[in-house]
């Protein structure tokens, strides 16, 4: 009975099935790794003093005791030439005591020793040239083990032999997988278990192969010192959140908290999302050196124990995108935690403070005994259906919900008020306006004899009669509800009520093949089993291109749509600028104002070698549309405003389900 509620709450969960690789089974990274890395602040210019002072700060500032233990020296540590025996060595001007001594220093502090290398012939950041590990994997793995290294971050520069080993090649002639596999296998031959962090920049959809080789993998290109980078990165995370789990973590890149780039609310958003998406939490700021010390506000963000606990939760399940309101400038991500808890994040993309509401059904819930607002430091109790709070510009309402009731379930003791034989249930949620909701009334004791009860809602002027057979504890009926969270249901009966369950209509699906195309749009047949559930898609939706259909509705009002779309426009080169991993779509009903949604990536196959190059993988998001009337309605899927974005073409369109 609750299945359909779960389906419409988990709005981003509909994706083409992919056979994913099993994780590397070695007992490491059962929760995402935490630590500190030189790169974000010091680029490729680290030295021994920098690493040691920041490592000491991890301890002195209380960060290591919270889990930040891996200390990694990124690019800039080695030299152009190997030793006569072919082994790696360090730059002894920058690291006069040497890397083994650095490892001893870190281990004496109770920290873990991380090094950086590259799967190419040179390290990223060359020139000045620093030798890479390509063709030297076994020897370098032995060297790392002899230095008592605890983790290896393994990059992807200067690696494509077929094109002359360029610094960067986002479309290499072959998948990066074999190069990372070579180092993974070499590490596994050592007598020391080493955390392997794969840094392939999201090339060739590593979620399909990296979990079998390493403990984390970069989902995309580097984080950049600008607020827009957050939207770009989480759009790339969206289609692979279900892959996260013990020993296999999608890496959203190192943290910029403390680098004086973001405002405090922006840092809270950044840290919140990385935490609940189960990314490794690797500090990229200068904690303490001769010139710099992290500010207190940023340090407090990094030390927020609840947020760290979300990241390190034993269940190991990532949050996923649930709803996105593009024009209104906010969205909801949510996921499960251990002990039946739920974490939810409501992101305010606008740079001004506003009151935002989380409708609990959007995250699969109807009631929460407690709602803890992490960044506000407040707790609300007995929250029914909706929770509202003020969210700073670019900030996030981060919530922990406990003692919850599943969506669509309304216990009388929580939602009902009784007077005599009349019980009124309040705060009833309706995702769409429809006369086809099913109410199931559960009684706390069997009916002693056949009884006729009446049921009404504020969306219906007359009461509905339903007959309860003798000895029955359940009766169901069809009732109307209006989209929103303020519906009421009134029931008259002498039988004591335990709870009601409310189920929305299944709706009707309209495939893209039923739409009339205009302008630039084209209909394409996909490979067998792809572009689900239709097998075809409409593409090349320019700002003047449309797909139009006439759709019948049984009632007027606002209707909830589930739109199936495809987007694999990955921001590689464009990630340094305004690339966002998103594309635009609009839905217009009866010439009303279009409802716009900027959809994230959906691709779950390699953009270079996979079926359809990732452009056959469907995902789903929901949106509420207005302007519906009883009878026939003109529905237009288009790309209104697309010419104002970075990418003028919209996402590909597969179909829509209208909940009427």
Curated annotation (Swiss-Prot):
Keywords: Carbohydrate metabolism, Disulfide bond, Glycoprotein, Glycosidase, Hydrolase, Polysaccharide degradation, Secreted, Signal
Record GO cellular component, one term: extracellular region
Chain positions carrying an annotated carbohydrate: 47, 91, 129, 182, 191, 351, 403, 460, 492, 506, 514, 584
GO MF assignments: alpha-galactosidase activity
GO biological process: polysaccharide catabolic process
Any Pfam family the entry gives: Melibiase_C
Cellular compartment(s): Secreted
N-terminal signal peptide: 1-20
Disulphide-bridged cysteine pairs: 124-157
UniProt-annotated catalytic positions: 155, 222
Chief localisation class: secreted
Xref: CDD domains: CBM35_galactosidase-like, GH27
Enzyme Commission identifier(s): 3.2.1.22
Annotated transmembrane regions: none
Organism superkingdom: Eukaryota
Residues engaged in binding substrate: 200-204
Reaction it catalyzes: Hydrolysis of terminal, non-reducing alpha-D-galactose residues in alpha-D-galactosides, including galactose oligosaccharides, galactomannans and galactolipids
Gene3D superfamilies membership: Aldolase class I, Golgi alpha-mannosidase II
UniProt function note: Hydrolyzes a variety of simple alpha-D-galactoside as well as more complex molecules such as oligosaccharides and polysaccharides.
Similarity comment: family membership: Belongs to the glycosyl hydrolase 27 family.
Name of the protein: Probable alpha-galactosidase D
């Amino acid at each position: 009975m609750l299945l359909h509620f779960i389906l419409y709450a988990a709005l981003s969960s509909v994706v083409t099935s992919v056979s994913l690789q099993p994780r590397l089974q070695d007992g490491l990274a059962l929760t995402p790794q935490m630590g500190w890395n030189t790169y974000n602040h010091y680029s490729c210019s680290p030295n021994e003093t920098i690493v040691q002072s920041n490592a000491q700060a991890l301890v002195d500032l209380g960060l290591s005791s919270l889990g930040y233990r891996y200390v990694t020296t990124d690019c800039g540590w080695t030299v152009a030439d190997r030793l006569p025996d072919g082994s790696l060595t360090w730059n002894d001007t920058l690291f006069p005591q040497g890397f083994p001594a650095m490892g001893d220093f870190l281990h004496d502090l109770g920290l873990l020793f991380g090094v950086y290398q590259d799967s190419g012939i040179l390290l990223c950041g060359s020139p000045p040239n620093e030798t890479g590990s390509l063709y030297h994997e076994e020897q370098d793995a032995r060297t790392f083990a002899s230095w008592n290294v605890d983790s290896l971050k393994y990059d992807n520069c200067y690696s494509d032999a077929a094109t002359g080993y360029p610094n960067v090649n986002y479309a290499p002639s072959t998948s990066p997988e074999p190069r990372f596999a070579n180092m993974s296998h070499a590490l596994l031959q050592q007598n020391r278990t080493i955390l392997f962090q794969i840094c392939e920049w999201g090339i060739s959809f590593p979620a399909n192969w990296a979990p079998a080789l390493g403990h984390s993998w970069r989902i995309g290109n580097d984080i950049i010192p600008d607020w827009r980078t957050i939207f770009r990165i989480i759009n790339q995370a969206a289609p692979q959140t279900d892959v996260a789990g013990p020993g296999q973590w999608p890496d959203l890149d190192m943290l910029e908290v403390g680098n004086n780039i973001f405002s405090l609310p922006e840092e809270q958003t950044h840290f919140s999302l990385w935490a609940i998406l189960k990314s490794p939490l690797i500090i990229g700021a200068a904690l303490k050196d001769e010139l710099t010390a992290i500010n207190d506000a940023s340090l407090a963000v990094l030390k927020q124990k609840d947020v760290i606990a979300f990241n390190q939760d034993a269940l190991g399940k990532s949050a996923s995108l649930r709803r996105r309101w593009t024009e209104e400038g906010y969205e909801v991500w949510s996921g499960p935690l251990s002990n039946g808890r739920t974490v939810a994040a409501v992101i305010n993309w606008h740079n001004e403070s506003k009151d935002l509401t989380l409708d609990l059904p959007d995250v699969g819930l109807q009631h929460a005994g407690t709602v803890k607002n992490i960044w506000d430091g407040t707790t609300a109790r007995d929250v029914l259906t909706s929770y509202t709070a003020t969210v700073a510009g670019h900030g996030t309402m981060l919530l922990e919900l406990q003692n919850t009731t599943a969506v669509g379930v309304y216990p009388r003791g929580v939602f009902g008020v009784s007077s005599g034989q009349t019980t009124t249930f309040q705060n009833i949620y309706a995702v769409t306006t429809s006369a086809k909701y099913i109410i199931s009334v559960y009684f706390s004791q069997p009916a002693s004899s056949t009884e006729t009860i009446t049921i009404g809602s504020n969306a219906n002027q007359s009461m509905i009669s339903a007959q309860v057979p003798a000895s029955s504890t359940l009766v169901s009926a069809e009732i109307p509800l209006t989209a929103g969270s303020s519906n009421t249901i009134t029931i008259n009966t002498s039988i004591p009520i335990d709870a009601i369950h409310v189920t929305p209509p299944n709706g009707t699906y309209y495939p893209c093949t039923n739409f009339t195309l205009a302008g630039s749009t084209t209909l394409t047949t996909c490979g067998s089993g792809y572009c689900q559930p239709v097998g075809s898609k409409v593409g090349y939706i320019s700002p003047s291109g449309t797909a139009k259909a006439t759709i019948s509705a049984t009632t007027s009002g606002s209707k909830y749509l589930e739109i199936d779309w495809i987007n694999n426009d990955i921001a590689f080169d464009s990630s340094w600028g305004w690339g966002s991993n998103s594309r635009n779509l609009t839905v217009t009903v009866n010439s009303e104002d279009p409802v716009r949604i900027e959809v994230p990536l959906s691709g779950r196959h390699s953009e270079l070698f996979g079926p359809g190059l990732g452009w056959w993988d469907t995902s789903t998001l929901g949106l509420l549309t207005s302007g519906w009337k009883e009878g026939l309605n003109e529905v237009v899927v288009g790309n209104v405003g697309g010419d104002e974005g970075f990418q003028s073409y919209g996402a590909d369109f597969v179909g829509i389900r209208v909940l009427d």
